[in-house]
Amino acid sequence: MPDGWRKMGVLVFYDLPVVSPEQRLAAVRFHKFLLADGFERMHYSIYARYCGSMERAATYERRVEQALPAVGHVNLLKLTDRQMVGMRKWIRGNYRAPENAEFVPPAQYQLF
């Protein structure tokens, strides 16, 4: 199997209810778990992590499963290195980050 098919990345998408204080706390805890576990926030509820191998991707899949809140919708998508490289990001127009948002430089990844 070619190398680019063995190296993996993981995307986590979630939609969690935040109606009650307990649900908000669970959503915040899940968000903080993902950041502490090395995931990079790509969008409001989309997080990505480069894993390097299928085995490590499976490890992070188990870790996310163990951290799931009691209520909500969470998807995990495993992508090959070649699929991750094909991802594109555009920010257009007069987009500005909120005033209270702090800039966090992206993590440096070693891809090869």
Swiss-Prot record:
Q: Which UniProt keywords apply?
A: Antiviral defense, Endonuclease, Hydrolase, Magnesium, Metal-binding, Nuclease
- Superkingdom in the source lineage: Bacteria
Which GO biological-process labels does this protein carry? defense response to virus; maintenance of CRISPR repeat elements
- What EC number(s) is this enzyme filed under? 3.1.-.-
Query: Is tRNA processing given among the entry's keywords?
Result: no
Q: Where does Mg(2+) bind?
A: 15
Please give the Pfam families that the UniProt record associates with this protein.
CRISPR_Cas2
The GO terms describing molecular function are: metal ion binding; RNA endonuclease activity
Q: What class of enzyme is it?
A: hydrolase
Cofactor dependency = Mg(2+)
Asked if the keyword Metal-binding belongs to this entry, the reply reads: yes
Q: Which SUPFAM superfamilies does the entry mention?
A: TTP0101/SSO1404-like (SSF143430)
Q: Which family does it belong to?
A: Belongs to the CRISPR-associated endoribonuclease Cas2 protein family.
What role does this protein play? CRISPR (clustered regularly interspaced short palindromic repeat), is an adaptive immune system that provides protection against mobile genetic elements (viruses, transposable elements and conjugative plasmids). CRISPR clusters contain sequences complementary to antecedent mobile elements and target invading nucleic acids. CRISPR clusters are transcribed and processed into CRISPR RNA (crRNA). Functions as a ssRNA-specific endoribonuclease. Involved in the integration of spacer DNA into the CRISPR cassette.
Assembly with partners or alone: Homodimer, forms a heterotetramer with a Cas1 homodimer.
Its name, as the record gives it, is CRISPR-associated endoribonuclease Cas2 2
Gene it is expressed from: cas2-2
